[in-house]
Amino acid sequence: MEQAWRWYGPKDPVSLSDIRQAGATGIVTALHHIPNGEIWRIEEIKKRKTEIENAGLSWSVVESVPVHEEIKTQTGNYQKWINNYKQTLRNLAQCGIDTVCYNFMPVLDWTRTDLAYELPDGSKALRFDHIAFAAFELHILKRPDAEKAYSQEEQVAARTYYDKMSEQDITQLTRNIIAGLPGAEEGYTLDEFQTQLDRYKDISSEKFRTHLAYFLNEIVPVAQEVGIKMAIHPDDPPRPILGLPRIVSTIEDMQWFVETQPLPANGFTMCTGSYGVRSDNDLVKMTEQFADRIYFAHLRSTQREDNPLTFHEAAHLEGDVDMFNMVKALLNEEYRRLNQGETRLIPMRPDHGHQMLDDLRKKTNPGYSAIGRLKGLAEFRGLEMALKKVYFNK
């Protein structure tokens, strides 16, 4: 696999030099300074690509070209944003970039309630507390009809949780959920957030699928034409939240996805941490079934807690994900491609490392501090080497 690393551009506290020292060769990044929906101009792409290459690295994957909210709701200028998206793909291809990760999650890209959950060893992780999230929905946001999403027992637990919160706790939880996490292109005030949610009140999962299908049927033929692999990222967490439709969460969703737009350019980002939150997702089976459509991998693990809807980010080789067999399945597919004459390795990045050691004293992007990902990348490198020697005679 190609060892890659997510970089948030020149303002990222982790420098390109740091990344190269970590042993990565590929960069996963985006033009975060360009507003959602606007065309990525060739000169802007080339500028960022040259910056990366001057550091001895390559721009391996775009993560992400954001999908404008009006595309997701099919309102306003959605056709304009789709046409802009097509031109961005053409421009990326002209600059030699061949893989684009994106998501179709409404309003929020990914959601956590705690960005500094302290583990027993003193390191810090990201966490999603189901009851804390319920307290936010029911008593802070006060989303209409939110109680329908929770059992009576959960509502009581959420009320108890909320009653113990200080004003600072409320502010922090709200900020964690709606202010935008790394990689998210939108942040909101509480009122703006509810306004965004209201845009989806009449959009069921079935209707939302028709919106995704329309997007795919517009975009994927262009990607196929110019030689770009589109790799959709799963919902995070992979279940309905905030009354919003979530349609990239299960193996059934993956099957619908490839049947809806069967061109080879239409593929997946296998994010083990996102899919792995659900105990009914068999990650190895999902990887094997859709192996030829996996164009990018995010490798991380999560640990479900006593409440199975609550989870935290585990160490990369621990937690609920069978990382040994996951990496083995990815290598099986990679060697199949190589044996058929393909030369492109599957780009993989260690995702959401723990904040640890010296990084505990630094300002870092939540989930994207250097040392935790350095540790994860080294572990994956060792696991890959062992698997190759034992199973692939390499």
Swiss-Prot record:
Its EC number is 4.2.1.8. It comes from the Bacteria. Keywords: Iron, Lyase, Manganese. Belongs to the mannonate dehydratase family. Gene3D superfamilies: Divalent-metal-dependent TIM barrel enzymes (3.20.20.150). Pfam families: UxuA. It comes from Haemophilus influenzae (strain PittGG). Disulfide bonds: none annotated. Its cofactor is Fe(2+); Mn(2+). It catalyses: D-mannonate = 2-dehydro-3-deoxy-D-gluconate + H2O. The gene is uxuA. Pathway: Carbohydrate metabolism; pentose and glucuronate interconversion. This is Mannonate dehydratase. One of its GO terms (biological process) is D-glucuronate catabolic process. Catalyzes the dehydration of D-mannonate. GO terms for molecular function: ferrous iron binding; manganese ion binding; mannonate dehydratase activity.
